[in-house]
Amino acid sequence: GEPFEPKNQRALLPFLRRVRRELPQKTIWSFTGFTWEELHDPAAYPRCEVTDELLSLLDVLVDGRYVDALHDISLRFRGSSNQRIIDVPKTLHPAF
């Protein structure tokens, strides 16, 4: 399913907190059909009260809807060229 549907965000948050606490050396990835901009727009769906914390627990986010016309088998970790691989800590904290 889509991890950034609000009900899924609320369900995933305790799990991600636990992973961060117990396995801090692990790199946490998430894939979403929503864009980074949609996740940060206060008025946009699927933002909810836990979105910011959930994002802060991620290391890498692959964002954007899969577009069949943009499918490219040469891409790593994404299915279509419109999808981006985002380094979350560097994006949230540019001086990081």
Q: Where are the predicted features?
A:
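Short amphipathic alpha-helical surface micro-motifs
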Residues: A43-Y45, R65-A69
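Short secondary-structure boundary segments
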Residues: T32-G33, G64-Y66
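Conserved, mostly hydrophobic/aromatic
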Residues: L61
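P-loop/Walker A phosphate-binding loop and immediately adjacent motor/lid segment at beta-alpha junctions
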Residues: F15-R20, H71-F96
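Conserved Radical SAM active-site core
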Residues: G1-E49, E53-L54
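Short, well-ordered, mixed-charge alpha-helical segments that flank or form enzyme active sites
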Residues: K7, E37-H40, A69-D72, P94-A95
